[in-house]
């Protein structure tokens, strides 16, 4: 079995633009790249060529608090105030990873996980 130890849940990476659809030019820190947060489990990350991620944006419309699917991140590894865009969960091939940025703190990761549960209504009873 092939293992892929280079990406973990909570990591922030720059990925190639073509890894994500609908990228907004103003959200890019490096031209042709976009930051993402890895949200898939480490068990999956170590054994799969794909990662589940959410894009990270510093766009003002993501930071105004009007959309509960945008989670403000308080990570020192981010150069400016940014939000995880939970409404754009996607899976990417790890070949799109460009460079490691850092790791978010445990509270931010918990807030992202909670927002994902709410966004997908994982615990809603019909």
What is the predicted function of each stretch?
Residues 1-126:
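Conserved functional hotspots at enzyme active or ligand-binding sites that engage polyanionic ligands
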């Amino acid at each position: 079995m092939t293992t892929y130890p280079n990406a973990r849940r909570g990591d922030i990476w720059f990925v190639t633009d073509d890894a994500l659809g609908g990228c907004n030019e103003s959200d890019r820190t490096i031209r042709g790249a976009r930051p993402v947060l890895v949200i898939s489990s480490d068990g999956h990350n170590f054994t799969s060529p794909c990662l589940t991620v959410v894009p990270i944006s510093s766009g003002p419309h993501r930071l105004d608090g009007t959309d509960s699917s945008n989670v403000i991140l308080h990570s020192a590894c981010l150069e400016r105030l940014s939000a995880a865009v939970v409404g754009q969960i996607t899976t990417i091939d790890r070949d799109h990873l460009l460079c490691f940025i850092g790791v978010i703190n445990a509270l931010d990761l918990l807030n992202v996980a909670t927002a994902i549960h709410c966004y997908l209504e994982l615990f809603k009873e019909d």
